[in-house]
């Protein structure tokens, strides 16, 4: 099948209906059939099960339980240098660099706006214009829990409705404004080096996006942007330490980080197309 046909079919496919159906099937307990699908998936995508807390495919009652499997203790040591921002996920670097004139690079020849990504909030986007961004793609074989790259306090969460195109490299190179048109959950944190956004982007067959404080954010979905504000002090403040889990995808997708101007410099290991490993150096706090 040609690349053009693959992209064209995505425009025609009822992506929300397909994704919700996949989500229901992935959460169903189907005994031997579930186990057979999990074993096929492990073989098809070369999933490294030796790192899982429970490496036995037959131990998972649903496909979703397998997909968001925990890793064994110590499988992903978190860099303990207080000036190092660590990778939030096992993934692959799609794009990274400066947010120039409010624009982020999606792929060669494609840009999109920080304001659109953040749900149309111009005031929020202004906090990141002139800063840095990084887009990390989680493939089907990756560990699909997302962690905190640094110590932070949750300020706001925004659900942004949208489409559910695939987010693989082929689609990123061919569908304009991909990450600003797909359904997403925007998490805004305050850190010692300024504001940081961690955006969880949905995609075809991603049955749900969850956070550790709100549980399942989507589905269900709605037609309007929804915003939750959180206290920055007091008993109800939500604080994270570097390396703590903050969310998860039930099937693969993308994480986008935005940083304020003059707050960080990316680690020299950062290159487009290079795999990332949770807990390893992502960036450094600017001196």
From Swiss-Prot:
Positions bearing the site annotation: Cleavage (non-hydrolytic): 252-253
Catalysed reactions, as listed in the record: a 1,2-diacyl-sn-glycero-3-phospho-L-serine + H(+) = a 1,2-diacyl-sn-glycero-3-phosphoethanolamine + CO2
Cofactor, how bound (note): Binds 1 pyruvoyl group covalently per subunit.
EC number per UniProt: 4.1.1.65
Keywords: Cell membrane, Decarboxylase, Lipid biosynthesis, Lipid metabolism, Lyase, Membrane, Phospholipid biosynthesis, Phospholipid metabolism, Pyruvate, Zymogen
Lipid biosynthesis listed as a keyword: yes
Assigned GO CC terms: plasma membrane
Active site: 90, 147, 253
The UniProt record lists the keyword Transmembrane helix: no
A single BP term in Gene Ontology: phosphatidylethanolamine biosynthetic process
List of residues that carry Pyruvic acid (Ser): 253
Membrane association type: Peripheral membrane protein
Subcellular localization, as worded in the UniProt entry: Cell membrane
Post-translational modification: Is synthesized initially as an inactive proenzyme. Formation of the active enzyme involves a self-maturation process in which the active site pyruvoyl group is generated from an internal serine residue via an autocatalytic post-translational modification. Two non-identical subunits are generated from the proenzyme in this reaction, and the pyruvate is formed at the N-terminus of the alpha chain, which is derived from the carboxyl end of the proenzyme.
Pathway(s) annotated for this protein in UniProt: Phospholipid metabolism; phosphatidylethanolamine biosynthesis; phosphatidylethanolamine from CDP-diacylglycerol: step 2/2
Cofactor list: pyruvate
GO MF entries: phosphatidylserine decarboxylase activity
Family: Belongs to the phosphatidylserine decarboxylase family. PSD-B subfamily. Prokaryotic type I sub-subfamily.
Function: Catalyzes the formation of phosphatidylethanolamine (PtdEtn) from phosphatidylserine (PtdSer).
NCBIfam families reported in the protein's UniProt record: PS_decarb
Complex formation: Heterodimer of a large membrane-associated beta subunit and a small pyruvoyl-containing alpha subunit.
Protein name: Phosphatidylserine decarboxylase proenzyme
Native species: Aliivibrio salmonicida (strain LFI1238) (Vibrio salmonicida (strain LFI1238))
Taxonomy of the source species: Bacteria, Pseudomonadati, Pseudomonadota, Gammaproteobacteria, Vibrionales
Gene from which the chain derives: psd
């Amino acid at each position: 099948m040609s690349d053009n046909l693959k992209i064209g079919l995505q425009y025609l496919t009822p992506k929300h209906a397909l994704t919700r159906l996949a989500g229901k099937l992935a959460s169903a307990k189907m005994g031997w059939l579930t186990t057979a699908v999990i074993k096929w998936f492990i073989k098809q995508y070369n999933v490294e099960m030796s790192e899982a807390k429970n490496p036995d495919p037959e131990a998972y009652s649903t496909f979703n339980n397998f997909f968001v499997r925990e890793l064994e203790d110590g499988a992903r040591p978190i860099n303990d240098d207080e000036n190092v921002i660590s990778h939030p996920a096992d993934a692959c670097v799609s794009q990274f660099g400066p947010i120039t004139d409010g624009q982020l690079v999606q792929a060669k020849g494609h840009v999109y706006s920080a304001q659109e990504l953040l749900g149309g909030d111009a005031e929020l986007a202004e906090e990141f214009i002139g800063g840095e961004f990084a887009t990390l793609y989680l493939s089907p074989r990756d560990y699909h829990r997302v962690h905190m790259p640094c110590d932070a306090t949750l300020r706001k969460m925004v659900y942004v409705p949208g489409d559910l195109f695939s987010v693989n490299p082929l689609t990123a190179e061919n569908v304009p404004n991909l990450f600003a048109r797909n359904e997403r959950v925007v998490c805004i944190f305050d850190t010692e080096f300024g504001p940081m956004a961690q955006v969880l982007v949905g995609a075809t067959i991603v049955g749900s996006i969850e956070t550790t404080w709100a549980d399942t954010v989507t589905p269900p979905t709605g037609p309007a942007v929804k915003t939750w504000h959180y206290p920055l002090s007091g008993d109800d403040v939500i604080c994270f330490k570097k390396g703590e889990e903050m969310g998860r995808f039930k099937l693969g997708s993308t994480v986008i980080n935005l940083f304020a101007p003059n707050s960080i410099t990316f680690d020299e290991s950062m290159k487009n197309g290079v795999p990332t490993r949770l807990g390893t150096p992502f960036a450094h706090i600017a001196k």
